[in-house]
Amino acid sequence: VAEGIDAHGLAANKKERDAKVIELLETVGLQAEHADRFPHEFSGGQRQRVGIARALAVNPDFIVCDEPISALDVSIQAQVINLLEQLQRERGLTYLFIAHDLSMVKHISDRIGVMYLGSLVELADSEELFENPMHPYTKALLSAIPIPDPDIEKNRQRIMLEGTLPNPIDLGEECKFCSRCPVCKDSCHKSQPKLVEVKPGHFVACSQCAE
């Protein structure tokens, strides 16, 4: 936690640095005694809180959260998300939240970007994306989210992507999703589609969706 403080010269001396560390630990729900522990002495949730404290140490406006809850139990995931939301309200933070759990992404995000093989294929406000997905890959992802109602769940139609993944280091000129896309046409093999605004604030990289 103190590393960022030292690197950026944010404390005049060791006493001030140690005080900042304790303040940061308490901000994320830990205690002063945790400052003297080794990493293996923390639980998974506590380690995530330490990571958040480290990020806060340099007084950021923008934080990249790369899979911050993927290895945690569901109850701990909720605690970490609640902490992130609380800090966002209190400090006016902006997050880039990277995750595979689409339900959690919907909960915490204002805008969502869907990526496939390193490229954005769809970008829209959270509610708009979930209510009106346009790219075939986005539709397949959303169809895989389980619904906690057995009557609805058993009758849902999931979109199963067939085909194989292309070689990511030799994609050629065609659309990256061609080999698995259910609406692929001959024109899709000729060029990679650009991200186009198809309605206000809603962007899609698919020549079939943009028509």
Segments and roles (model prediction):
Residues 3-9, 115, 145, 178, ...:
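ABC-type ATPase nucleotide-binding domain
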Residues 5-9, 15-33, 142-143:
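Conserved ABC ATPase "signature" region
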Residues 19, 36-38, 156:
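Interfacial catalytic loop of ABC nucleotide-binding domains
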Residues 38-42, 46:
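Conserved ABC ATPase signature
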Residues 57-61:
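A short, proline-enriched helix->beta-strand linker immediately N-terminal to the Walker B motif
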Residues 64, 68, 72, 76-153:
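P-loop NTP-binding/switch modules centered on Walker-like glycine-rich loops
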Residues 125-211:
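Charged, flexible cofactor/metal-binding loops and thiol motifs
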